[in-house]
Amino acid sequence: KVGRHYFRVAQAQDNRRVNPNRIRKSIGAERSFTEDLRTLETMAAALVTIVDEVEARMLKAKKMGYTLTLKIKYADYRQITRSRTVDLPMQQATDMGILAQALLEHHLEPQPRVRLLGVAMANLVPAQLVGYQQLSLL
């Protein structure tokens, strides 16, 4: 019975209703690189661009988040995700960048060849509940 269901789904036959107005559970961005990143410095520079985009999306959505998730995909397509939850919600790229950088440094393999980096914020709350002006957490 389950096998038939998955066969139909694989054939794009799915009659379930689509809800285009679902509540967003996370806001993030990721980048695939044409050449593998091999140094922490190049990865840190890429993270700056990524967290800037996440900040812009969070500002547009008027959200703040408690949990940051870093995604690392290596050249051999192995992938890891690591998360950290903070006590106060954040929205600023500087705070997200510092936290993402710390996760990267802690979990990066020796002699890495990174193909993709991503950052997402989850445990979202409306920004107006905590105020639009976020104080630095660091």
Predicted regions and their residues:
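DNA-contacting surface of Y-family translesion DNA polymerases
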Residues: K1-V114, L124-Q134, L138
